[in-house]
Amino acid sequence: RNGSGKTTTANIIMGHPDYEVESGIVELNGENLLEMETWERARKGVFLSFQYPQSVPGLQVGNFLRKSVAAILGDEAAKGSEFRKKLKESMKELDIPASFLGRYVNDGFSGGEKKRFEILQLMLIKPKLAILDETDSGLDIDGIRTVAKGINAAIRGTDSGALIITHYSRILEHVQPDKIHVLIAGKIVKTGGPELALELEEKGYDWLETGSDK
């Protein structure tokens, strides 16, 4: 539900400066992320796909991607034929044309282009934890399928994980979740497997607030 704390949770994990955590820890691979700066969390493998990505006029997509990969994975990862091959393969997977690289970051992008660009970054960086904040929002069925294909390609065969924040179960038809958590008023009120998504589609959320399972 809107206002339940989903985006707040994502921003806290990533280290947004507007949020202060008074207690608790956020642990990844045995390390407390709350003790790190945002850039340190990124280098440790945390990636956040924004719900509303900002445009950056004057910065070309190709340059942005190369610099991003270099900043997270090191300069060598952003050089040579191997990087170009991976970039080309990832763009093909997401149905992104080569001309996209010459455009400015999110400048004049459609909603679908912004979402695919976020997933393109995910595929190139291959983080340990990808936080995808309503990546499926505003997409049609084909768009959801394409984005899901990119998510699967990024985490398949790795020890990486994805925290997918969504209002709907449609994307879960293409990205198989291990666990589903329902967040209401800042608290996890229900946890289950993939079948929980179907139950929520059928019943909505009111039964979780009232405590009834009818």
Model segments located where?
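Helical segment within the ABC ATPase nucleotide-binding domain
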Residues: 144-159
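Walker B catalytic motif
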Residues: 134-135, 142
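ABC ATPase NBD Q-loop/coupling interface
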Residues: 25-41, 106
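ABC-family P-loop ATPase nucleotide-binding domains
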Residues: 54-128
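Helix-to-loop junction immediately C-terminal to a conserved catalytic motif
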Residues: 14
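Conserved H-loop
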Residues: 159-167
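Conserved beta-strand-loop-alpha-helix hinge in the C-terminal portion
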Residues: 179, 183, 187-210
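Walker A (P-loop) phosphate-binding loop of ABC-type ATPase nucleotide-binding domains
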Residues: 1-5
